[in-house]
From Swiss-Prot:
Keywords: ATP-binding, Cytoplasm, DNA replication, DNA-binding, Lipid-binding, Nucleotide-binding. Oligomerizes as a right-handed, spiral filament on DNA at oriC. It comes from Burkholderia multivorans (strain ATCC 17616 / 249). GO terms for biological process: DNA replication initiation; regulation of DNA replication. This is Chromosomal replication initiator protein DnaA.
Length: 524
């Protein structure tokens, strides 16, 4: 029995992602084998994992058992009686290797202050009486007299030193002390959002890797870096993390985070006040520009023109530009073609909705940050029912915590169902397999009936596999249930389709884009 389980575990570890294996297979243990009845009993640490493994992996484990013993084996799943004595199984997504980063705003500010002090001792400060250049004076005037134009002033000695490169030189570092706080005020960065507290999974691992590469080599690796994806998937978190990491590494860097709507507003005000020269000087002098939700530039020709000039100047000076949007660059309507071509000249990366294991990790980490020990059962229950984005998960967790506190009850699955009653009702009627089949059939111009047929031409089989993949990702149906809805196919056929499309999605940009469009369409 134990020999079989070692063999089975080794095969499943090769077939599954590390996250899936650690979450679902590693916590299991064989507890009994009845040779006369040909039954194998496998224990799971909790009810949720028992149900999930039974629906998703029982067929594969039974196949491996049959091959091992050369006989049909009935696989039974039971609750581990020692489950309460065990520590919770790992559900968090392992973070990609990286040097330790500061955690939380206080630690980040403290680390930057320490870097500032070190830089000040190593680099002579600029004289206090250096006169302010016209550029800095204009920015200072706009910042103080016209506060609603969002151009933070730069320290006088930075402006006097001229445009810096990424390597700090004489006069580049601002004064120590409270300057770390003022740098956050000027950059508009949120010190809470760091790489250290960004939960990584399959859905965002490429985006995180690209972000780290850009933070380590700004203006060199990928310029621009364009991140796109739906609301609440972590785009803003990642670009703030890049800015925060750069401030830690190069405290004198000129960094600016701005939402596209604020940029549009500033262009309008600069136009009204005839302050475009000052506006240009400020943005063209940055080392890192982070612009969020650029789809808000749609139809705003003057804003697009000014941003084009800023983009060209920054890239020419080897400054880094990072952009986010809710959709693929070429899908943004009302944006000038020359801007689209600039967006495509760097690296474009999609951030997808988090997979189940990643959603669990997000919930448990967020609960931990709130000082709450959230049980794995509850985290899995919430993650299984709420699939769209991180903000939705965090909002659900806040409701659960508030409901628990108000009623003076411990957090359990029953309490969670009560707290999220309205939200779960909405979720349960959102996406059906039938809707997925119709949407995919329309997208690829085939008949819905082809989803159930036995036809195997590539122009039919491929969309059918895509529909199976989306059914697995976007609904709570088990593999056998999905197979039944696709013309009574075996669950192994569905599993093959899901794995095939998931693997190709990570390698094929066009397929990834098509899936992103389909997912956005289905989610409305």
């Amino acid at each position: 029995m134990n020999d079989f389980w070692q063999h089975c575990s080794a095969l499943l570890e090769r077939e599954l992602t590390p996250q899936q294996y650690v979450t679902w297979i590693k916590p299991l243990a064989p507890v009994a084998f009845d040779a006369s009845a040909n039954t194998l009993s496998i224990a799971a640490p909790n009810r949720f994992k028992l149900d999930w493994v039974k629906s998703q992996f029982s067929g594969r484990i039974a196949d491996l058992a049959r091959d091992f013993w050369n006989a049909p084996i009935e696989v039974q799943f039971v609750l581990d009686p020692k489950a309460g004595m065990r520590s919770p199984a790992a559900g968090a997504a392992p973070a990609a290797p990286r040097a330790p980063l500061a955690s939380g705003p206080a630690a980040t500010v403290a680390a930057i202050a320490a870097n500032l002090t070190a830089n000040q001792s190593a680099t002579p400060a600029a004289p206090a009486d250096v006169p302010m250049t016209p550029s800095a004076a204009a920015a200072h005037h706009l910042n103080n007299d016209d506060a609603d134009i969002d151009l933070p002033s730069l320290p006088a000695h930075e402006a006097a030193a001229g445009r810096r490169t990424w390597r700090p030189g004489p006069g580049a570092a601002p004064a120590a002390g409270g300057e770390a706080d003022s740098m956050y005020e000027r950059s508009k960065l949120n010190p809470v959002l760091t790489f250290d507290n960004f939960v990584t999974g399959k859905a965002n691992q490429l985006a995180r890797a690209a972000a780290i590469q850009v933070a380590d080599n700004p203006g060199i690796s990928y310029n621009p870096l364009f991140l796109y994806g739906g609301v609440g998937l972590g785009k803003t978190h990642l670009i703030h993390a890049i800015g925060n990491q750069l401030l830690l590494d190069k405290p004198g860097a000129r960094i600016r985070y701005i939402h596209a709507e604020q940029y549009v507003s500033d262009v309008v005000k600069a136009y009204q006040r005839k302050a475009f020269d000052d506006f240009k000087r400020y943005y063209h002098s940055l080392d890192l520009l982070l612009i969020d939700d650029i789809q808000f530039f749609s139809g705003k020709s003057r804003t697009q023109e000014e941003f084009f000039y800023a983009f060209e100047a920054l890239v020419a000076n080897k400054a880094q530009v990072i952009i986010t949007s809710d959709t693929y660059p070429k899908e943004i309507s009302g944006i000038d073609d020359r801007l689209i071509s600039r967006f495509d000249s760097g690296l474009t990366v999609a951030i997808e909705p988090p997979e189940l294991e990643m959603r669990v990790a997000i919930l448990m980490r967020k609960a931990q940050s709130e000082g709450v020990n959230l049980s794995e059962d509850v985290a899995f229950f919430v993650a299984k029912h709420l699939r769209s984005n991180v903000r939705e998960l965090e909002g659900a967790l806040r409701k659960i915590l508030a409901y628990s506190k108000f009623h003076g009850r411990e957090i359990s699955i029953e309490l969670t169902k009560e707290a999220l009653k309205d939200l779960l009702t909405v979720q349960n009627r959102q996406i059906s397999v039938e809707n997925i089949q119709k949407t995919v059939a329309d997208f690829y111009n085939i008949k819905v009936a082809d989803m159930y047929s036995k036809k195997r031409p590539a122009n039919i089989a491929r969309p059918r596999q895509i529909a199976m993949y989306l059914a697995k990702e976007l609904t709570q149906k088990s593999l056998p249930e999905i197979g039944e809805l696709f013309g009574g196919r075996d669950h192994t056929t569905v599993l093959h389709a899901v794995r095939k499309i998931a693997d190709e999605r990570s390698k094929d940009a066009q397929l990834n884009h098509e899936l992103h469009v389909l997912e956005q369409t289905l989610k409305g």
